Amino acid sequence: MTNSKQKLVLASGSPRRLELLHQIGIEPARLMPMDIDETPVKLEHPRTLCRRLSQQKAEAAQAALKSEQAWKDAYVLGSDTVVAVGRRIVGKAEYTEEASAALHLLSGRSHWVYTGICLVTPDGKIRQKVAETKVRFKRLSTREIDAYIASGQWRGKAGAYGIQGIAGAFVQKLTGSYTNVVGLPLYETMSLLSGEGFEVTSGWLEG
């Protein structure tokens, strides 16, 4: 558990991000998924996109909390993950056809996973980091792609795959942060929080 005097609000409903925070002993006091427009600006770089969206999520959550006195001292954490081949963004697929197209694109080549994290401190400071990971997929057969789509594990995930599931077997090589690909880079997140006075290690006590 975190320090009882400190509260962290996670501006996300992602179970993967919540699990990753639990991994380093952090229990968010509140989850606040923010419904924002995630459409890229024309010619926007994937790195810029994830940075912008993570900030928008964090700021939207903080704005929603302003009217609640009990949350005026909360830290707010926003995060957004973007998958790209070069500068081509591979978004969250809504339909099986989109998922199939994404997996065919990623098959046998390298892609980048960018995650932007944004922390809004109790005094309103905004701090940001972006993590980058290079991932290479093996060449996928049509049968593998069809079976993966049938599993449903692509739903709601950037790039139409989740590395922590079946798709972990597709990864030939990974350079950088694994937790970044899952959805929240833990090194960067811990660095951001501790750098702004949030007691990360208070949740590490046995029992």
From Swiss-Prot:
Q: Which reaction does it catalyse?
A: dTTP + H2O = dTMP + diphosphate + H(+); UTP + H2O = UMP + diphosphate + H(+)
Cofactor(s) essential for the protein: a divalent metal cation
GO MF annotations in UniProt? dTTP diphosphatase activity; UTP diphosphatase activity
Check the record and name the Pfam families matching this protein: Maf
The UniProt record lists the keyword Hydrolase: yes
One GO biological process this protein is involved in is:
nucleotide metabolic process
Where does the record place it?
Answer: Cytoplasm
Q: Where is this site: Important for substrate specificity?
A: 16, 81, 164
Primary localization class, coarse: cytoplasm
Active-site residues from the entry: 80 (proton acceptor)
Task: Kindly indicate whether the keyword Disulfide bond belongs to this entry.
Answer: no
Q: From which domain of life does this come?
A: Bacteria
Q: Provide the alphabetized UniProt keywords.
A: Cytoplasm, Hydrolase, Nucleotide metabolism
Task: Give the enzyme's EC designation.
Answer: 3.6.1.9
| Disulfide bridge positions per record | none
| InterPro entries recorded | ITPase-like_fam, Maf-like
A single cellular component GO annotation: cytoplasm
Record-stated family: Belongs to the Maf family. YhdE subfamily.
Protein role: Nucleoside triphosphate pyrophosphatase that hydrolyzes dTTP and UTP. May have a dual role in cell division arrest and in preventing the incorporation of modified nucleotides into cellular nucleic acids.
In Swiss-Prot or TrEMBL terms, this protein is called dTTP/UTP pyrophosphatase
